[in-house]
Each structure stands twice: as C-alpha cells, then as structure tokens.
C-alpha cells in the first residue's frame, strides 16, 4: 500500500477490493470472473463516485487490492460493564447469577473507574473498525446513574455513540415514575433511547404499558432486553406483539435477546414474529452471551443453545 502525505486531505482511495454485494450491477470482471478493483472518491465525508480500475490513481491512497468494508456497527454493547471480568466472577451459572455478580461489582463503579473502562472499550472498538456503537447503561433507580453521564462525556474517537437507559421493568410500575424516567432520557441529548429489562422474574403487564406509553409521549425509540431466557412462560414478546397490533408505536423498537422464542415450537413463534415484523420491530441476537448464559448449570452440559430465531424472523 502507498499513501499520500499525512497532511493531504483524504479525497479517495484507489484499488480497493470490495465484496460483491457492495458492487453495482454490471461491474466489470477479469477473464477469471473476479471483479475489478475500485477507486472510491470522497466528498463531504461520503462516497461520491465508484470507478472500476486495476491501476493506482495518483493522489489517492493506494490499497493495492486490500479488502475494503463499510464501518462496523455494534448494535448492543454495555460500556458501563466492560473490563470487569477480572474482578467479577459469578458464583453460579446462568444469566441471573451473572447479573448478581455485576451488581456486586458496582461498589467499584466510581466515575473515574467508569471513564477508564468505557474509554478503553471505545478505543478498542474504533481500532477494530467500529463506526457506530449503541451502549446500554444499567439504571438501578428512577434517577440516572453516574454511568449515564460519564458515558455521555467520553471522547468517542470518531464513533457515533448511542445510549440506552436499561431500566428494570418494575421501575415503570407507577405511571408518574415511568414518565419521569422517560423525561430524563429525552432531556439527555441526542441519540438516547429508552430500554428495559423484561424477564419472567419481574414480569408486569401494567409496567410494560407505562413503558411504551411514556416512550411514545417523549418521542423516544425503544431497545428492550426482552425474554432473555429459555422459558415457555416468558410473556414479553407475546405481550408486545399483541399490544402493537392494537396500539401501534410511533417510533422504532429493537428487541434484544428474545431467547424464549427458541424454547417453544415453530407454530408458537410464527405468529409472534409475523406481528413484530408487521410493525417494523428489529430483533437483535447476541450469540456469544446467550450461548454462555442460557441453559447453564455447573456440572451439566447445556442442552439448548439459547439463540433467538433469526432465520425464521427474516
């Protein structure tokens, strides 16, 4: 690879190898069927032109055929919890034990500790090509935690950062408190979303109603930790699908985890997925987390994988 002077503005890159799905129809190929390399011209931070080439273009960064991909998107992170594994070891297996261990670690969560760990995580993400990151931030009361403000103050090193208030569902039980939480999130600046931890251990239909109503009133999008369990009695996604069929939500909803869909039959899951798709709900899977924590018991091999129904949700 060859690069112009570091003082020169980046106006484009030459001889980039793009994946086939990123090339326009009719892109020329070599005799062996391999697509030609590409010159990309930039203007105002966007790709202004895409030109087939096999020769380096003077004045552009010459990538000499290196693979070139769009910036990575991390749709589900927890910057407030990063780099805690060395001091946070669950005594039991499974999700709820992991949550308990993380709550025990909160005694270390000074503002300086949060800044140090979250900054390191963002820097590592940027170094690995992440350009957009959404971080959930645990709330433990109706008041915004220190991490909510500290993560807002981070140097984002070129990453577009979103914050989601991850609030336990019972905190939405009282309408006035639900309204206060939504108001705080809405007044926290750009790229803030309302979220909730929704599980059979804390299920409350009235709190769900208050959560969605308050988010709608304050023009907030939602990203919900919902049905993160392999339990056929979990009700979150079923309730949400039914609620949206009667009360469409004005913003966008993401549902993270959704493991419970894999615990029932395809016949049970299909109508739920159809209703969620009809309302534009996005389903986010977290395979590494769910493979580790779902159906987990010390001394027993997990029988179920814990990954939500991604193929069926397409």
How would you label these PLM feature ranges?
Residues 85-136, 142-156, 180-186:
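Alpha-helical scaffold segments that flank or form the walls of functional sites
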Residues 40, 45, 65, 76, ...:
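Divalent metal-coordination and catalytic microenvironments
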Residues 1-56:
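N-terminal metal-binding scaffold of metallo-dependent hydrolase/deaminase domains
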Residues 101-116, 164-176, 197-202:
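Active-site mouth loops of central-metabolism enzymes
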């Amino acid at each position: 690879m060859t690069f112009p002077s570091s003082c020169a503005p980046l106006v484009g890159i030459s001889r980039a190898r793009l994946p086939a799905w990123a090339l326009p129809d009719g892109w020329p190929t070599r005799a062996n069927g391999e697509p030609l390399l590409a010159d990309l011209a930039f203007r105002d931070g966007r790709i202004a032109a895409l030109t087939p080439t096999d020769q380096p273009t003077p004045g552009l960064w010459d990538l000499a055929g290196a693979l070139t991909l769009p910036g990575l998107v991390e749709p589900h992170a927890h910057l407030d919890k990063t780099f805690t594994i060395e001091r946070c070891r669950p005594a039991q297996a499974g999700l709820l034990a992991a949550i308990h261990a993380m709550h025990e670690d909160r005694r270390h969560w000074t503002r300086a500790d949060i800044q140090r760990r979250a900054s390191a995580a963002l820097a590592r993400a940027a170094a690995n090509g992440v350009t957009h990151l959404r971080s959930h931030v645990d709330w433990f009361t109706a008041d915004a935690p220190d991490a909510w403000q500290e993560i807002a103050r981070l140097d984002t090193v070129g990453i577009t950062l979103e914050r989601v208030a991850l609030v336990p569902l019972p905190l939405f039980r009282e309408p006035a408190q639900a309204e206060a939480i939504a108001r705080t999130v809405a007044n926290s600046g750009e790229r803030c979303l309302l979220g909730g931890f929704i599980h059979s251990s804390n299920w409350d239909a009235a709190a769900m109603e208050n959560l969605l109503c308050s988010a709608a009133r304050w023009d907030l999008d939602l990203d919900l930790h919902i049905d993160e369990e392999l339990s056929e009695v979990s009700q979150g996604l079923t309730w949400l699908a039914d609620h949206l069929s009667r009360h469409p939500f004005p913003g966008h909803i993401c549902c993270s985890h959704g493991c419970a869909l894999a615990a029932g039959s395809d016949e049970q899951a299909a109508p739920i997925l159809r209703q969620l798709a009809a309302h534009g709900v996005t389903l986010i899977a977290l395979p590494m987390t769910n493979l580790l924590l779902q159906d987990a018991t010390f001394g027993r091999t997990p029988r179920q994988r814990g990954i939500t129904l991604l193929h069926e949700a397409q």
